[in-house]
Design a protein with these regions (language model features):
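Short amphipathic alpha-helical interface segments
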Residues: 25-67
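C-terminal accessory region of radical SAM enzymes
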Residues: 243-246, 286-314, 339-383, 389, ...
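Cysteine-cluster motifs in flexible loop/terminal segments that predominantly coordinate metals
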Residues: 373-422
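N-terminal [4Fe-4S]-dependent radical SAM core
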Residues: 8-14, 19-31, 71-114
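Canonical Radical SAM [4Fe-4S] cluster-binding loop centered on the CxxxCxxC motif
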Residues: 106-142
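Radical SAM/AdoMet-radical enzyme domain recognition
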Residues: 113-114, 130, 142-163, 170-283
């Protein structure tokens, strides 16, 4: 008997007793004991050839006595997990299904929209991905935003993220959210936090989650990349949420070379002092000149992830732009995502009567829906391709002018992150 399998199959240590076995070509994985891991190594070494007497003798060198029925049971378990296959037909079918599953589905519906009610901001963050956009744009009225969002809700969009600019620069933000919020609609606010304290009592009942940007509890360190404006308000905000609703707030830090050495200590301090989760995000360069600012964010270790229940699962990743995500600027122009609100990526205007057809048939939409990691040079043969997805197309475009360009400067980090997600997958499901 000969088993078929992906030659790049990965064995990743999970803990002292177990391992994660991952099959890259079909993105299937399972947790395995030491005994099963030994069998996998044997199968790989023998190129899939199964001779039961040889396997029995192989195990004896580890002082393990196994019967043929036990070995068959192990193999059946690996086959049921779709890590190994008894015949070529099953292997080919699995490969075809995987490739079809990764492609964009025409029935995919938009379910998340980034709302930019304004691009005005009272900060001037050095790494802002929207800093090149003019804050002098016209802005839709209160009633226009309410009507637009209610139309999107009727299309089954159920997640609205208010961002900017600083969304709280709009004095009517509370009015807009109050009008569109219901039990089936999730609302999130991305804010620098400086203006939030004065309005948090009104927003807390109608907003599901808040993300506030902060790099340090030290005003001088925080001001290196951000601003000192409203710093005390942000600290008061942490204390408020710590007491009232710690699970509704996340603190987001952008990792750069200026803060890479202190960010983990900052994360720990926020979590221990306020009971609030921290989210570290990579710096997104706006051009090649900013590549020098990139630092590799720390990968949360397993103990930290267990303690704070961070979700680092092993989902198959692909960019959601134009498939389940859209972004709308202050004038109502629609874009694939919040990081690519550039003239060349404008899809339509939300006020147009036929905007849905325009978006669906746009050449920009087709470009994003045709992005496949299996077609990317340097990625298509990588064992981690379905876990990392090849990286962010917005970064690739801003740095290289090509949505499909390989992000060599992020590759090592993305591999480490992928391996960690593999190790964490079963912890999360416990």
């Amino acid at each position: 008997m000969k088993l078929l399998y992906d030659k790049k199959i990965i064995i990743e240590k999970y803990d002292d007793e177990n391992y994660i076995i991952y099959s890259p070509f079909n993105h299937k994985f399972t947790k395995a004991s030491k005994s099963v891991k030994k069998l996998v190594l044997y199968i790989l070494n023998e190129n899939g050839e199964i001779e039961f007497e040889n396997i029995i003798n192989y195990y004896k060198q580890f002082d393990i006595e196994l019967k043929i029925d036990e070995i068959k049971k192990y193999i059946d378990t690996l086959v049921k997990a779709k890590l190994f296959f008894y015949n070529q037909e099953d292997y080919d079918t699995e490969k075809r299904i995987t490739l079809e599953d990764y492609r964009f589905s025409p029935t995919q519906e938009i379910d998340m929209v980034y709302i930019h009610p304004t691009l005005r901001c009272n900060f001037n963050c050095s790494y802002c991905y929207n800093k090149s956009l003019a804050a002098t744009q016209k802005e839709l009225t209160t009633n226009q935003w309410i009507q637009i969002i209610n139309k999107l809700k009727a299309m089954n969009v159920n997640y609205f993220i208010f961002t900017g600019g600083e969304p709280l620069m709009r004095k009517d933000l509370i009015d807009i959210i109050r009008e569109i919020k219901d039990d089936n609609t999730k609302v999130e606010i991305l804010s620098n936090g400086s203006l939030l304290m004065d309005k948090v009592d009104q927003l807390l009942p109608i907003v599901d989650s808040f993300v506030v940007s902060l790099d340090s509890l030290d005003i001088k360190k925080n001001s290196i990349n951000r601003s000192a404006v409203g710093f005390n308000n942000i600290i008061n905000l942490l204390e408020y949420f710590s007491e009232k609703a710690p699970k509704k707030l996340r603190v987001r830090s952008v990792i750069t070379k200026e803060n890479i050495d202190t960010i983990q200590a900052f994360n720990n301090e926020i979590q221990e002092k306020y009971g609030i989760k921290c989210v570290n995000v990579r710096f997104i360069p706006n051009n090649k000149d900013e590549l020098s600012l990139i630092a590799e964010p720390p990968i949360p270790d397993i103990d930290d992830t267990k303690k704070y229940k961070l979700d680092l699962g092993i989902r198959k990743y692909r960019c959601g732009a134009c498939s389940n995500i859209l972004a709308i600027n202050p004038e109502g122009d629609i874009y694939p995502c919040q990081s690519l609100m550039l003239p060349e990526f404008k899809l339509a205007n939300i006020l147009d009567d036929n905007w849905q057809d325009t978006v669906a048939n746009s050449e920009v939409t087709k470009k994003f829906r045709n992005i496949k990691v299996d077609d990317m040079e340097n990625c298509k043969d990588c064992a981690y391709r379905y876990i990392c997805g090849g990286g962010c197309p917005a970064i690739a475009y801003k740095v290289y002018g090509d949505l499909n360009h390989h992000l060599s400067f992020f590759c090592d980090y993305l591999e480490k992150e992928s391996r960690q997600r593999m190790r964490m997958a079963k912890i999360i499901s416990k």
